[in-house]
Amino acid sequence: MLQADFVRAFVNKCAQFGLSVGLETCGNFKWEHVHDFISDFDFIYFDIKCLDEELSTKYTGQSNRTILRNLEKLAATAGTSKLIISIALIPGITATEENISSLIELCKKLGITSVRLLPYHTLGKGKYVELGRKYLMDDGLKITDEEVREIQKRLESNSIHCIIEGF
């Protein structure tokens, strides 16, 4: 969280007016910058990609150690009722047997009971073209409704509530 001082002031001001405030984060922040106000959010969407450190480094360019450590601290500090894991379901990358099993294990370990499933799509591809950047994802990547529902069933059979968005 690069603008922690602003976010802290904003959350406090919103609370004065009785406004609900949510946070969406990839979790790659310094805990000492947010520990004193992270519990003030009404809900937190926490993005998780690959739970395997080697795959995380391969696909995101960095280790997921800080992210997972912050998730553990967040679950302990803010409480798991506010916490919703978000995961983009990318075939062969995040929508794998191993990654979903690791996600279930992580949720059970931390007591997290809600997950947002975000099926992969190519809607952002045009932005890359407009910016003159190469789109690195394979055009053939597709996740079917059936595959998404199967992942949803696996999570829900482990007492993890699922929200499917962009489906």
Indicate where each model-derived feature is located.
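Auxiliary Fe-S-binding modules of radical SAM enzymes
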Residues: 89-167
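Conserved AdoMet/S-adenosylmethionine-binding subsite of the radical SAM
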Residues: 1-123
